[in-house]
């Protein structure tokens, strides 16, 4: 007996389909349910909290089964996608009436976290990306695709640190990687990782796939021909998306190179510490995006977040944005634009569903509404003069052909799905109207028949009705059933009534059902044709979506600048940051009392500030606000200050706060030192560096030595623009030794046992740390504070006599260098030229090097 003969025909069909989709859950349509079997059923019952049952047996074993109703499937899919799972949707494609054996079924779509376009499965204001990563000889290729907009990009990060930063910036919902991928730590703690065969990343295959998608002979026109590692990733990505969507992807028309040197680079730690779109707790409250994002459309919100995560260095492009925001602010145009933009809505994702032919009737109705509001938008935009804004207005101009087509084709309030018809408007197609009239005319016929039969037979309880099981029928009460004539054929007996059928009614039933099914078939055909009629306009419609998104972001930033009293920053090529009365954009919004604004001045003669002052005095806020103002200026946004001049910044680094990375077995101090090492290796004179309390996690002398050495290295070797906050007062000596350093401090005033923080930045070093006063504020018992004060007096008396209180007295003989220096062996090895040595000399050299160890 063959193995497959041990299974029923239906289970054989299921197992064949499951073998084609082994890695993902298979939703197998059976009547009104999607069923899952075997391990899929066990997994789904846990993830979705649904009952696990059994269905008969196959191969002698009971089959585990779980199911979800087809009409509620979107909710279950949303939950699975959120958990990083992919699902193959298997539908009945054969006709049950004509099928011998199981109805023919096929997988019609695969829903994956990175390729979903259905509204119910997407976060409205966050990009939904799928990405692919490739690694070779220490370098990376990385490609991302937003299937909901067609935005397809690649880049080539040169280090693992840069790759980690890209992964955090893009936050893909799904990540494809080759089976032999080595830097597996990049994959840690991520949902939606997908292992793919190595051959899918081959360069020739990738180029072939991409040229086929774009209809090109080569990729030179996209400027990506030389990015071989990036193309390997992009090729795998486009193939995977085609496999899962099982349809053409006409909205993906180009591939762009994302060049690192065009952006201000933010590493993973910096994005986390600055709380740009996500706070340290993982939420979205009290983030920069929450303050800045009052956009009218979801697509505008997504664009603003892309700007925030990828600040630009191109000063002319930034000035263009600032000019546009300034003009909108001066005209207060945002008050007119916002209501119109809200009516246009999120057409970007509707267009993606249109391109994938998965749009629903209400998508078409919303697209029609958006088209109706474009003339109103164009009218408002006529007030604008700046070339950037007039060009956006031009791209956002109405497409009359699309408006007219949707107006004629779609009913005013169509149903959710096309399945039961009622979507295509009357007057759009004469044949459809004819069949609909025939079906509608049924009501008149039935009313007339009911009246005639009542009068003819004298049965006043006679009624004509219809249900899905028995079709049309004549119903007579049990008390009058003796009056029915002989040609009435009984169809059903109820408790208080009898139901009959007569030839005229049966003939009418056939005609009505035939006209309804004919009308539905024509309507579905017209629906499919509507996609064909709209697709030629897809590129123009996508340009409209992009332009409207940009207009939304710009009007939003103009409104924020006006409402929150922001100023226009001056962008310059030279390195430096000069801010008058700068404020923290988030903290000032959550404070009850007025925010104390502070200045900062970093220039060629003043590259580093050593910041001292009490805990809770505002050092971290001051540092973060400087970085956030610089970041906002580099997206072309007005900033919270009286005035600001921001030089060209290539990277922003932060070493602020830390916690144990228990999952990776790294202590707080190890995390701190790893981030410090990254800064010391990668910062440049054009970088903005924030260093907060370096060296806290180790002994006093170790910490002081590391902080001192790090500050010296940043000042002398790198010459980066640095804000260096410290509780080591010894570091305030550094400005006396290095001319480009300066001391600033945040002060506090003690009054008895209480303390008042001034939050104002002043020149010079702080006089004391006020640590005991802060401990008192935190609720440390008074007896403990008193004991600590006595101990402090003792230690201060000792330090007056002890030379070790000065950095010069620190014993560094047993300290390892934070900045690696070549050992004696390495220096000797560097001087050896193997090509000049005889075998004997080489052996002698080897012995000599051995002795140096």
From Swiss-Prot:
It holds the Pfam family MutS_I. InterPro entries: DNA_mismatch_repair_MutS, DNA_mismatch_repair_MutS-lik_N, DNA_mismatch_repair_MutS/MSH, DNA_mismatch_repair_MutS_C, DNA_mismatch_repair_MutS_clamp, DNA_mismatch_repair_MutS_core, DNA_mismatch_repair_MutS_N, DNA_mismatch_repair_MutS_sf. SMART domains: MUTSac (SM00534), MUTSd (SM00533). One of its GO terms (biological process) is mismatch repair. GO terms for cellular component: cytosol. Keywords: ATP-binding, DNA damage, DNA repair, DNA-binding, Nucleotide-binding. One of its GO terms (molecular function) is damaged DNA binding. Coiled coil: none annotated. ATP binds at residues 613-620. This protein is involved in the repair of mismatches in DNA. It is possible that it carries out the mismatch recognition step. This protein has a weak ATPase activity. Belongs to the DNA mismatch repair MutS family. This is DNA mismatch repair protein MutS. It comes from Vibrio atlanticus (strain LGP32) (Vibrio splendidus (strain Mel32)).
